[in-house]
Protein backbone atom coordinates (compact mmCIF):
# COMPACT_ATOMS: atom_id res chain seq x y z
CA UNK A 1 0.00 0.00 0.00
CA UNK A 2 3.03 2.30 0.04
CA UNK A 3 3.39 4.83 -1.36
CA UNK A 4 -0.26 5.53 -0.61
CA UNK A 5 -2.90 6.51 1.96
CA UNK A 6 -1.82 4.20 4.79
CA UNK A 7 -0.36 5.40 8.11
CA UNK A 8 1.31 2.95 10.51
CA UNK A 9 1.60 3.73 14.22
CA UNK A 10 4.72 2.13 15.70
CA UNK A 11 6.53 2.17 19.03
CA UNK A 12 9.12 4.90 19.22
CA UNK A 13 12.56 3.30 19.51
CA UNK A 14 15.37 4.53 21.79
CA UNK A 15 17.53 7.01 19.96
CA UNK A 16 14.83 7.86 17.42
CA UNK A 17 15.95 11.15 15.79
CA UNK A 18 12.40 12.42 15.21
CA UNK A 19 11.67 15.44 17.44
CA UNK A 20 9.52 14.72 20.50
CA UNK A 21 7.36 17.72 19.61
CA UNK A 22 5.99 15.81 16.62
CA UNK A 23 4.64 12.90 18.70
CA UNK A 24 2.36 14.94 21.01
CA UNK A 25 4.01 13.48 24.10
CA UNK A 26 3.21 9.89 23.13
CA UNK A 27 5.69 7.01 23.03
CA UNK A 28 4.55 6.10 19.53
CA UNK A 29 5.23 7.52 16.10
CA UNK A 30 3.05 7.52 12.97
CA UNK A 31 4.69 7.00 9.59
CA UNK A 32 3.31 7.39 6.06
CA UNK A 33 4.79 7.45 2.56
CA UNK A 34 2.65 9.69 0.32
CA UNK A 35 2.10 8.83 -3.33
CA UNK A 36 1.62 12.40 -4.57
CA UNK A 37 4.50 13.27 -6.92
CA UNK A 38 4.95 16.74 -5.41
CA UNK A 39 5.13 15.32 -1.88
CA UNK A 40 7.59 12.70 -3.13
CA UNK A 41 9.78 15.41 -4.65
CA UNK A 42 9.70 17.45 -1.43
CA UNK A 43 10.84 14.41 0.54
CA UNK A 44 13.68 13.82 -1.92
CA UNK A 45 14.84 17.44 -1.63
CA UNK A 46 14.67 17.47 2.17
CA UNK A 47 16.24 14.00 2.51
CA UNK A 48 14.72 13.57 5.97
CA UNK A 49 11.32 12.76 7.50
CA UNK A 50 8.81 15.63 7.43
CA UNK A 51 6.34 16.31 10.24
CA UNK A 52 3.03 16.97 8.49
CA UNK A 53 0.09 18.06 10.65
CA UNK A 54 -3.36 18.48 9.12
CA UNK A 55 -3.64 21.52 6.84
CA UNK A 56 -6.91 22.78 8.33
CA UNK A 57 -8.27 24.24 11.59
CA UNK A 58 -8.80 21.44 14.12
CA UNK A 59 -12.20 19.80 13.92
CA UNK A 60 -13.23 21.41 10.65
CA UNK A 61 -13.73 19.96 7.17
CA UNK A 62 -10.56 18.42 5.81
CA UNK A 63 -9.01 20.16 2.79
CA UNK A 64 -8.75 18.40 -0.54
CA UNK A 65 -7.47 21.36 -2.58
CA UNK A 66 -4.97 24.17 -2.05
CA UNK A 67 -7.89 26.63 -2.01
CA UNK A 68 -9.37 24.79 0.99
CA UNK A 69 -6.04 25.10 2.82
CA UNK A 70 -5.84 28.81 2.04
CA UNK A 71 -9.42 29.34 3.19
CA UNK A 72 -8.72 27.78 6.58
CA UNK A 73 -5.16 28.88 7.29
CA UNK A 74 -4.59 32.13 5.37
CA UNK A 75 -2.32 34.43 7.36
CA UNK A 76 -1.07 31.58 9.56
CA UNK A 77 1.23 29.79 7.11
CA UNK A 78 3.97 31.02 4.77
CA UNK A 79 3.58 28.69 1.81
CA UNK A 80 1.16 26.26 0.19
CA UNK A 81 2.55 23.55 -2.10
CA UNK A 82 -0.25 23.01 -4.63
CA UNK A 83 -0.22 19.47 -5.98
CA UNK A 84 -3.75 19.67 -7.36
CA UNK A 85 -6.90 18.10 -5.87
CA UNK A 86 -6.37 15.04 -3.67
CA UNK A 87 -6.89 11.96 -5.81
CA UNK A 88 -8.30 9.78 -3.02
CA UNK A 89 -10.32 12.53 -1.33
CA UNK A 90 -10.09 10.84 2.06
CA UNK A 91 -7.27 10.92 4.57
CA UNK A 92 -5.11 7.85 5.11
CA UNK A 93 -6.21 4.71 6.90
CA UNK A 94 -4.40 4.57 10.26
CA UNK A 95 -3.35 1.19 11.68
CA UNK A 96 -1.72 0.85 15.12
CA UNK A 97 0.93 -1.87 14.83
CA UNK A 98 2.54 -1.20 18.22
CA UNK A 99 0.76 -3.99 20.09
CA UNK A 100 0.08 -7.69 19.73
CA UNK A 101 -2.70 -7.19 17.16
CA UNK A 102 -3.29 -4.54 14.49
CA UNK A 103 -5.82 -1.89 15.57
CA UNK A 104 -7.81 0.24 13.14
CA UNK A 105 -7.54 3.77 14.53
CA UNK A 106 -9.15 5.49 11.55
CA UNK A 107 -10.72 4.07 8.38
CA UNK A 108 -9.50 5.87 5.30
CA UNK A 109 -8.41 5.68 1.70
CA UNK A 110 -7.60 1.95 1.86
CA UNK A 111 -10.56 -0.23 2.81
CA UNK A 112 -10.51 -2.53 5.84
CA UNK A 113 -11.04 -5.61 3.69
CA UNK A 114 -8.01 -4.87 1.51
CA UNK A 115 -5.78 -4.55 4.57
CA UNK A 116 -7.15 -7.71 6.19
CA UNK A 117 -6.53 -9.60 2.93
CA UNK A 118 -2.93 -8.35 2.88
CA UNK A 119 -2.46 -9.38 6.52
CA UNK A 120 -3.83 -12.85 5.80
CA UNK A 121 -1.51 -13.28 2.82
CA UNK A 122 1.38 -12.47 5.19
CA UNK A 123 0.22 -15.12 7.65
CA UNK A 124 -1.58 -12.74 10.03
CA UNK A 125 -5.11 -14.11 10.38
CA UNK A 126 -6.42 -11.71 13.02
CA UNK A 127 -9.09 -9.20 11.93
CA UNK A 128 -8.53 -5.51 12.56
CA UNK A 129 -9.76 -4.37 15.97
CA UNK A 130 -11.64 -1.07 16.15
CA UNK A 131 -10.61 1.65 18.58
CA UNK A 132 -13.39 3.50 20.46
CA UNK A 133 -14.56 6.99 19.61
CA UNK A 134 -13.53 9.61 22.17
CA UNK A 135 -16.16 12.04 23.46
CA UNK A 136 -14.63 15.16 24.96
CA UNK A 137 -18.09 16.40 26.05
CA UNK A 138 -18.32 13.67 28.69
CA UNK A 139 -14.85 14.30 30.06
CA UNK A 140 -13.51 11.09 28.55
CA UNK A 141 -9.98 10.85 29.98
CA UNK A 142 -8.67 8.77 27.08
CA UNK A 143 -6.16 10.70 25.00
CA UNK A 144 -6.58 10.49 21.22
CA UNK A 145 -3.75 8.53 19.64
CA UNK A 146 -4.68 9.44 16.06
CA UNK A 147 -6.45 12.25 14.21
CA UNK A 148 -10.20 12.01 13.79
CA UNK A 149 -11.01 10.02 16.95
CA UNK A 150 -13.17 12.69 18.58
CA UNK A 151 -16.90 12.22 18.11
CA UNK A 152 -17.19 15.62 16.41
CA UNK A 153 -14.67 16.15 13.63
CA UNK A 154 -14.52 17.09 9.94
CA UNK A 155 -17.43 19.42 10.74
CA UNK A 156 -18.85 22.22 8.59
CA UNK A 157 -20.28 25.35 10.19
CA UNK A 158 -23.77 24.31 9.09
CA UNK A 159 -25.64 21.49 10.79
CA UNK A 160 -25.65 18.11 9.03
CA UNK A 161 -28.48 15.56 8.72
CA UNK A 162 -27.59 12.06 7.53
CA UNK A 163 -29.48 9.38 5.57
CA UNK A 164 -31.77 11.93 3.94
CA UNK A 165 -33.77 10.93 0.87
CA UNK A 166 -35.48 14.30 0.43
CA UNK A 167 -34.58 17.84 1.40
CA UNK A 168 -36.63 20.43 3.23
CA UNK A 169 -36.80 24.01 1.95
CA UNK A 170 -34.00 24.95 4.36
CA UNK A 171 -31.56 22.18 3.38
CA UNK A 172 -28.87 21.69 0.77
CA UNK A 173 -29.05 17.97 -0.09
CA UNK A 174 -25.96 16.17 -1.37
CA UNK A 175 -27.18 13.09 -3.20
CA UNK A 176 -25.74 9.65 -3.89
CA UNK A 177 -26.89 7.06 -6.42
CA UNK A 178 -30.69 7.05 -6.73
CA UNK A 179 -31.08 9.99 -4.33
CA UNK A 180 -30.61 13.14 -6.38
CA UNK A 181 -29.08 16.29 -4.97
CA UNK A 182 -31.34 19.24 -4.23
CA UNK A 183 -31.04 22.88 -3.26
CA UNK A 184 -28.98 25.66 -4.77
CA UNK A 185 -26.15 23.37 -5.94
CA UNK A 186 -28.02 20.06 -6.39
CA UNK A 187 -24.78 18.08 -6.03
CA UNK A 188 -24.29 14.32 -5.86
CA UNK A 189 -21.29 12.51 -4.41
CA UNK A 190 -21.80 10.01 -7.24
CA UNK A 191 -24.84 9.71 -9.49
CA UNK A 192 -23.72 6.18 -10.40
CA UNK A 193 -23.34 5.11 -6.72
CA UNK A 194 -19.57 4.71 -7.14
CA UNK A 195 -18.06 4.75 -3.64
CA UNK A 196 -14.59 5.65 -4.88
CA UNK A 197 -16.02 8.66 -6.73
CA UNK A 198 -17.98 9.59 -3.60
CA UNK A 199 -14.81 9.46 -1.51
CA UNK A 200 -13.02 11.72 -3.99
CA UNK A 201 -15.88 14.25 -3.88
CA UNK A 202 -16.66 14.04 -0.15
CA UNK A 203 -14.77 16.96 1.37
CA UNK A 204 -14.88 19.19 -1.71
CA UNK A 205 -18.68 18.99 -1.78
CA UNK A 206 -18.96 19.50 1.98
CA UNK A 207 -16.89 22.67 1.54
CA UNK A 208 -19.18 23.84 -1.28
CA UNK A 209 -22.35 23.10 0.68
CA UNK A 210 -20.98 24.86 3.75
CA UNK A 211 -20.11 27.93 1.69
CA UNK A 212 -23.52 28.19 0.04
CA UNK A 213 -25.39 27.81 3.35
CA UNK A 214 -23.14 30.20 5.31
CA UNK A 215 -25.07 32.99 7.01
CA UNK A 216 -28.42 31.75 5.70
CA UNK A 217 -29.56 29.53 8.56
CA UNK A 218 -29.84 26.64 6.09
CA UNK A 219 -28.32 23.25 6.84
CA UNK A 220 -26.85 20.30 4.94
CA UNK A 221 -28.55 16.96 4.29
CA UNK A 222 -26.67 13.87 3.08
CA UNK A 223 -28.09 10.90 1.19
CA UNK A 224 -27.51 7.37 2.57
CA UNK A 225 -24.10 5.88 1.75
CA UNK A 226 -23.52 2.09 1.83
CA UNK A 227 -21.04 0.95 4.48
CA UNK A 228 -19.28 -1.46 2.11
CA UNK A 229 -15.56 -1.14 1.39
CA UNK A 230 -14.45 2.47 1.43
CA UNK A 231 -18.01 3.41 2.37
CA UNK A 232 -16.98 2.64 5.97
CA UNK A 233 -14.53 5.55 5.87
CA UNK A 234 -17.00 7.87 4.15
CA UNK A 235 -19.65 7.18 6.79
CA UNK A 236 -17.09 7.60 9.57
CA UNK A 237 -16.40 11.14 8.33
CA UNK A 238 -20.08 11.93 7.86
CA UNK A 239 -21.09 10.71 11.34
CA UNK A 240 -18.42 12.89 12.91
CA UNK A 241 -19.43 15.85 10.73
CA UNK A 242 -23.02 15.47 11.94
CA UNK A 243 -22.23 14.84 15.63
CA UNK A 244 -22.89 17.48 18.32
CA UNK A 245 -19.91 19.80 18.53
CA UNK A 246 -17.42 18.98 21.31
Report residues per predicted region.
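Active-site-adjacent structural elements in enzyme catalytic cores
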Residues: 1-246
Amino acid sequence: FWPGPLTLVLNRQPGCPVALLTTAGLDKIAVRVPANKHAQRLLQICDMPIAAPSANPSGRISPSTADHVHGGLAGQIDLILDGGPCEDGLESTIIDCSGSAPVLLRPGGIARGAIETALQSAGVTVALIDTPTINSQTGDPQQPVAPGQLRSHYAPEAGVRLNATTASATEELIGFGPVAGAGQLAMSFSQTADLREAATNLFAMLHQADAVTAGTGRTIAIAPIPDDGIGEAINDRLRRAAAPRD
